[in-house]
């Protein structure tokens, strides 16, 4: 696999705000026409009001990461935010059998098509369940004909948690050939956004996406966490407007 600069240290909890952490993982191989490219991975951990932990898009299992998470509290929820982010939930469910595994739109069908066995316990919706409504808000970002995503807001810190709706790859972490490809896709830092192939899946349905964007902007996020690339740890609302200008 082509080498790509990762966000070391890997498999370590990195505080973002009180009760909110990131953990960066190894690269994965993402299929594109004609081959594969490496993607850095990242998960988010939130401490809920009851002291339990909420794990968004769990990365590859790692003993050191498990130990660090266990020191924070009991894992109660394992979240697949979209149908591309689910591959490690089965391993995490094995480690935390009492945790509830939450399915995103289309993920059950996607996992079955990839012959990956994942047992989900509940489905994500357009509003937060009582399990975490005090700590997190959420919405179902609609409009794509291919990939819909559940978006979350950490209420206390004003942190928006996205997965693939924005990708923001730093040029210094990419080999030259991949840098050009990512620039053409429109996902190169500092002007990261959804890649062009994903934006095209909203053709004829942008009205749905604009309504979802309006809800996110109404949250007035202060920072934006991304699964792939550099996060926006300040000016979150402005970065959100910039990254979604293609919906205009």
Task: Annotate the PLM regions.
Residues 74, 148, 157, 221-222:
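Short coil/turn segments at beta-strand junctions that form active-site/ligand-binding loops
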Residues 85, 167, 231:
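Short active-site segment of divalent metal-dependent hydrolases/proteases
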Residues 17-18, 29-30, 59-60, 77, ...:
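Cap/insert and terminal regions of metallo-dependent hydrolase folds
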Residues 49-52, 70-76, 222:
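Short, surface-exposed connector motifs at secondary-structure boundaries
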Residues 63:
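N-terminal active-site wall of soluble small-molecule enzyme domains
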Residues 1-58, 116-184, 211-212:
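Catalytic core of the metallo-beta-lactamase
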Residues 66-131:
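Active-site HxH/HxHxD metal-binding segment of metal-dependent hydrolases
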Residues 56-57, 76-82, 102-104, 161-163, ...:
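Active-site neighborhood of phospho(di)ester-bond hydrolases with catalytic His/Asp-centered motifs
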């Amino acid at each position: 696999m082509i080498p790509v600069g990762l966000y070391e240290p890997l498999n370590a909890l990195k505080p973002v705000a009180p009760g909110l952490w990131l953990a960066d993982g190894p690269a994965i191989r993402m299929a594109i026409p004609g081959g594969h490219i490496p993607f850095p991975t990242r998960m988010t951990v939130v401490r809920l009001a009851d002291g339990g932990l909420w794990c968004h898009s769990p990365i590859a299992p790692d003993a050191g990461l498990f130990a660090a998470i266990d020191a924070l509290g009991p894992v109660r929820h394992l979240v697949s935010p979209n149908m591309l982010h689910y591959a490690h939930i089965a391993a995490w469910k094995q480690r935390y059998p009492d945790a509830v595994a939450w399915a995103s739109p289309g993920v059950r069908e996607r996992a079955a098509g990839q012959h990956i066995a994942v047992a989900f316990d509940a489905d994500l919706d357009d509003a937060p369940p009582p399990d975490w409504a005090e700590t997190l808000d959420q919405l179902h970002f609609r409009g794509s004909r291919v990939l819909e995503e559940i978006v979350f807001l950490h209420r206390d810190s004003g942190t928006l948690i996205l997965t693939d709706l924005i990708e923001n790859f730093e040029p210094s972490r990419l080999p030259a050939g991949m840098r050009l490809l990512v620039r053409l896709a429109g996902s190169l830092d500092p002007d990261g956004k959804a890649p062009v192939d994903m934006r095209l899946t909203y053709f004829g349905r942008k009205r749905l996406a604009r309504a979802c964007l309006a809800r996110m902007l109404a949250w007035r996020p202060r920072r934006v966490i991304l699964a792939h690339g550099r996060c926006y740890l300040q000016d979150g609302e402005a970065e959100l407007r910039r990254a979604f200008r293609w919906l205009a």
